[in-house]
Amino acid sequence: MRFDIITLFPEFFASPLSSGLMAKALARGIAEVVLTNPRHFSTDKHQRVDDEPYGGGVGMVMKPEPLFAAVESLPALPRREVIYVTPQGQPLTQQHLWHWSRERDQLVILCGHYEGVDERVVEHLVTQEISIGDFVLTCGEIPALVILNGVLRLLPGTVGKAASLHQDSFEDGLLDYPHYTRPAEFRGWTVPPVLLSGHHGEIAAWRRAQQIERTRQRRPDLYARWLARTQGQAKTH
């Protein structure tokens, strides 16, 4: 799979791409990451990529010409998505990550800066707007890295035990269950006895109950959706 990151700061990605599972995945040829700086496509002698907004207002807006030129300079694979990371986008979910990992050959991720990009970029170049939360960051590189990491770990061969991917939080609409390891007792705090019992059925039931209760307490929005879906499935049987 190919990832194209359109960024004013390619150096931002140096450390993440050279460490951990992402570095191993790239070394194995599971994916390719190409960083493209839109400044290189500016026709301004000072390589400016931003200008003042029409209608007035604070801040600067990224110009359309360098962004269009940067994206159009890339090879276009048959199943390509052009993503703009912005607080105005759809909230990123695990379902987005799975969809891209299975249904796309190329992700082009546009990192915004300043007050954002010229709306013509969004209307005529971008195919999907994505937000990682209801907050504002200084740059689009951080959410771009979130998407890159989230999709990359789902590609076959990146994670050693592929089965573990389906036990993560959000895979079935619930949060993950608690995890414990040795020692069985630490500073007087003990591991739940059921996990030491060796009864796989009881362990599975305990973990499921923990998932449901944890989701109900911490993410009532997720719990409500899970409950509605579960009840709907029960009515169809």
Swiss-Prot record:
One of its GO terms (molecular function) is tRNA (guanine(37)-N1)-methyltransferase activity. Its EC number is 2.1.1.228. S-adenosyl-L-methionine binds at residues 112, 132-137. The keyword Heme does not apply. The gene is trmD. It comes from the Bacteria. Belongs to the RNA methyltransferase TrmD family. Keywords: Cytoplasm, Methyltransferase, S-adenosyl-L-methionine, Transferase, tRNA processing. This is tRNA (guanine-N(1)-)-methyltransferase. It is an enzyme of class 2 (transferase). It catalyses: guanosine(37) in tRNA + S-adenosyl-L-methionine = N(1)-methylguanosine(37) in tRNA + S-adenosyl-L-homocysteine + H(+). Pfam families: tRNA_m1G_MT (PF01746). The keyword tRNA processing applies. GO terms for biological process: tRNA N1-guanine methylation. GO terms for cellular component: cytosol. Specifically methylates guanosine-37 in various tRNAs. Homodimer. InterPro entries: Alpha/beta_knot_MTases, tRNA_m1G_MeTrfase_C_sf, tRNA_m1G_MeTrfase_TrmD, tRNA_m1G_MTases_N, tRNA_MeTrfase_TRMD/TRM10. It comes from Thermosynechococcus vestitus (strain NIES-2133 / IAM M-273 / BP-1). It is found in: Cytoplasm.
